[in-house]
């Protein structure tokens, strides 16, 4: 009789142990210290119990490096997984073009978005301040690749043809800046073949020997996976930093940022603060747990999992907010403005552009 009563208890204990072994790796705590659990309050059916105090946030992220840092947040703070103690849930969508993200912000279908840096500045001016800059999430990820061994410095690009994508955005302005600062006129000293997609640049690079292309991660990793003869000739972030080292107020190359609708930020400051803490923890998790993060990144089609596995350590994923964010962004946008005022929307953003909690 006693054995009959003990059997259900033993089975229950085994089930609990089994369930605990299947939980995902935990993200770093939002304070950067001990880990925080991603488990949620559940009913007897296993479905997360409803929490009337949870504020839903709609998030749009750009595929590629700009969206990578949000992968953990997108999975474990989704409405069906949100922890019981979280004041927010996050419903996310991945887009392939900046214009898709800004359209979602415009019509209120997205509250927060991860987009290219200069796109954020342009959109701010175009919409009379309808968004605010919340954080920097991606630093420089641009590289000059070569199927050969002739490019050892920026000077070696003179007279060459460079395949590139991203005309009118960060890639064009970054390339033009480092070329110009090295005494190379982008309009006459080199030939830049602008392609509509990174995949076209990759195809051109693969086609014949001594081809040169500018590519961002994770396409750099993809290229080197396809051919052992393709090498990284120049790191544009390093070239940028070398130029800026002599400046009175050095800037750095900033590829991606997180922005929020100004109205939403003003109405829900506590929710925005919670989101930023979760985002910080997500970035820490992605950088510290490459294998697990690569699977999440692939699951959400931000970057293919097998590529993300190798590329994540090179994607320069960060979380920078507040004064440090403003300093890095204002310096970077100033460099773009000096090249072409239209690149940042015709004027540098005012202080209201930069959110600080």
Sequence positions of predicted segments:
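Secondary-structure end/capping motifs
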Residues: 265-339
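Conserved C-terminal helix/tail region of periplasmic/extracytoplasmic solute-binding proteins
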Residues: 330-357
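Short, solvent-exposed loop/beta-turn-alpha elements that line the ligand-binding surface or hinge
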Residues: 78-88, 238-251, 317-326
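Short, glycine-/small- and polar/acidic-enriched structural segments
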Residues: 32-33, 46-194, 211, 217, ...
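Short, surface-exposed acidic
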Residues: 186-190, 301-313, 343-350
């Amino acid at each position: 009789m006693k054995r009959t009563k003990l059997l259900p208890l033993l089975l229950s204990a085994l089930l609990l142990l089994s369930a605990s072994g299947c939980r995902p790796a935990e993200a770093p705590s939002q304070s950067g210290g001990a880990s925080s659990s991603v488990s949620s309050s559940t009913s007897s059916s296993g479905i997360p119990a409803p929490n009337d105090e949870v504020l839903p946030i709609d998030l749009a992220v750009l595929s590629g490096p700009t969206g990578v840092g949000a992968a953990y947040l997108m999975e474990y703070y989704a409405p069906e997984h949100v922890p019981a103690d979280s004041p927010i849930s996050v419903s996310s969508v991945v887009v392939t073009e900046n214009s898709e993200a800004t359209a979602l912000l415009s019509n209120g279908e997205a509250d927060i978005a991860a987009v290219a840096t200069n796109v954020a500045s342009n959109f701010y001016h175009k919409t009379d301040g309808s968004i605010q800059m919340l954080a920097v999430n991606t630093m420089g990820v641009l590289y000059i690749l070569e199927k050969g061994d002739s490019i050892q410095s920026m000077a070696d690009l003179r007279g060459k043809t460079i395949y590139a994508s991203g005309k009118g955005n960060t890639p064009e302005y970054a390339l033009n800046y480092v070329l110009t600062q090295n005494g190379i006129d982008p309009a006459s000293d080199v030939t830049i073949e602008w392609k509509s997609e990174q995949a076209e640049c990759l195809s051109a690079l693969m086609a014949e020997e001594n081809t040169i292309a500018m590519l961002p991660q994770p396409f750099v990793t993809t290229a080197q996976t396809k051919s052992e003869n393709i090498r990284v000739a120049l790191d544009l972030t390093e070239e940028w930093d070398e130029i800026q080292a002599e400046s009175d107020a050095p800037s750095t190359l900033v590829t991606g940022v997180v922005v929020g609708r100004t109205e939403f930020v003003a109405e829900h400051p506590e929710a925005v603060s919670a989101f930023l803490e979760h985002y910080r923890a997500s970035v820490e998790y992605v950088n510290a747990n490459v294998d697990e993060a690569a699977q999440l990144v692939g699951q959400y089609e931000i970057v293919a999992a097998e590529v993300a596995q190798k590329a994540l350590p090179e994607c320069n994923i960060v979380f920078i907010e507040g004064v440090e964010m403003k300093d890095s962004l204002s310096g970077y946008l100033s460099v773009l403005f000096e090249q072409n005022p239209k690149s940042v929307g015709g004027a540098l953003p005012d202080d209201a552009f930069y959110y600080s909690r």
